[in-house]
Every structure is written in C-alpha cells, then in structure tokens.
Amino acid sequence: MLSSGFLLTLFFVTLVIAVLSGLIFLMPSVPVKYIRLHLTLLLLPVIVGVIGLITINGREVIGIFALDKLAWLVGAFVLALGFIIQKFSARYLLGDRNYRKYFPLYTFTTVFASIGWLSNDLRLIVICWGLTLFCLTQLIRLNRSWKVPAEAAKVSARSFIIGWVALLLAVVVFFIGTGDWVIDPSQDYDVSMSYGLKLIVDLLLVIAVIIPAAQYPFQSWLIESVVAPTPVSAIMHAGIVNAGGIILTRFSPVFDNNIALTLLLIISSISVLIGSGISLVHVDYKRQLVGSTMSQMGLSLIHI
C-alpha cells in the first residue's frame, strides 16, 4: 500500500513537471508537435490523484495538507478536466496567434486550483484561489487585439477581486475568533467563536461563493466571458464556477448560521429563475449555457 506522504510528494513532483512543460512550450524554438508530450505529462498528476482517491482511508493531515477522498477527488477531477480541455484546444486553437500562451495558463489555472483544495491551511487556500482567478482572467483577455475580451476581462476581474477579498476577510475574521488558520471538523465553533464573528464569517462566505458561481447579482462576469474561446469557457468548470460548493464543504463546521443560510437560499433561488430565463430567451448557444450554468450552480448551492 502506498503511503499518503509518498503519494502527496509524487503528486507535487508531477505538478511541477506539468508546469515546467507548459513553460517550455512558450519557447518559440520548441516545435508545435511538443504539445503531444505536454499532454502526456499532464496525465501524470491525474493518475496520482486517482490512486490517492482509491487508496485513502479516512482523513490524514500531512503538514499543511489534509488528504481525504474529497480532496483527492476534487484534485483529480480538476486536473482531468484540464487535460481534456487542453487536448481539445491542441487542434481547436491551432492557428491562433496566442496558441502557445493558452497551454501554460490552462496548466497554471488547474494546478493552483487542485493545490488549494488539498490544503488544510486557510491561508494557502486563499492564495491558490487568488492565483486561479488571476490565471482565468489572463485567459479571458489573452486576445488583446480585440477590445471586447479586454472589457470582459475587466468585468470578470472586478467580480473576482470582490469574491477573493470576501474569502480573505472571512479567513482573517475566523483567525481573530479562533486563533487558528485551520478548520477542525471535530470542533464546535458555536462554543469557541462568538455569535457576531461567526455571523460575519458566514456572510462573507456567502459573497465569496456566489461570485464564482455567477449567482445574482454577480452573473455579469460569466455572461461577458462568452467572448472568450470555447475552451476558456470550459476551463471555468475546472473547480472555478463550481468552487462555491467546495468552499462551503471545507467551511461546513463554521457555515451554519440561519441568517447566512437563508440569504444563500434566496440568492440561489433567484439565480435559478434568472438562469432559466436566460436559457429560454437567448438564441446564442453559449449564452444559453451561461443560463444553464447559473441555474445548475444555484441548485447545487440550494442543496448545500
């Protein structure tokens, strides 16, 4: 049986290899055919993640990382989806003037997301989440010669900054209330935290999760992002628009205030209706998918 420590080390080694491979592809002297090797290297962390998912029993904390089935599942899912999108992009984007830039940005986006969801330290989660959103913004604005993607990137960046700052403040307030950067699933935070601080954390978490999920009234960033190439829209589903459920799962020992839960329920319900309306009204299939995504994310947050 492979130990969790060995698998975690192997996982990070394969992530580093994937990142370096993406950077190598930026070099003009590297032939375009190198993309085949890059795609092969992208499979390595996915394989390690699947092995970790199969072999893990219970929950193991190794340094600043907490390994359980959810962590390995999300990590492997994000990287697998990233691999599929890059494989599709290898031919779909061929001929694009920014062809070489897409693949390292895809890789960075999924690598940072997967590391964040494996982390047990809230500070690392905030850092990785911020880097993931930054890379996604760069993907949206990659075609700088066209003003429309640049404006879409600005709208997305403003929304992402608000959501990221909300998550950062939630973590800081949590630290003020508990003196710890780690959420302990066995801890009763109704006792260890004051009601006021816990309410603030929960309300900040609501803001932090509804923005990446494109919930009302922050759906404009996803609507504007349809100007980006199809694979860029697809990469948003690699632990980004669906990150709200993951964040709330990680914060579940803290996120149980009735006011925050009711607010999230109302916002998600409104978003489901708006998303359904967008899907019915628009004839553009990408905007129909935006409406579908809003509705699906709203339903997932309602169930949480």
Could you describe each region identified by the protein language model?
Residues 68, 303-304:
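Adenylate-forming
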Residues 1-13, 117-136:
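Alpha-helical transmembrane segments and their immediate interhelical/interface regions
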Residues 1-104, 179-191, 195-197, 220:
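Transmembrane helix-loop-helix hairpins at membrane boundaries of multipass inner-membrane proteins
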Residues 84-100, 106-125, 135-302:
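Hydrophobic transmembrane alpha-helices and their helix-loop junctions in integral membrane proteins
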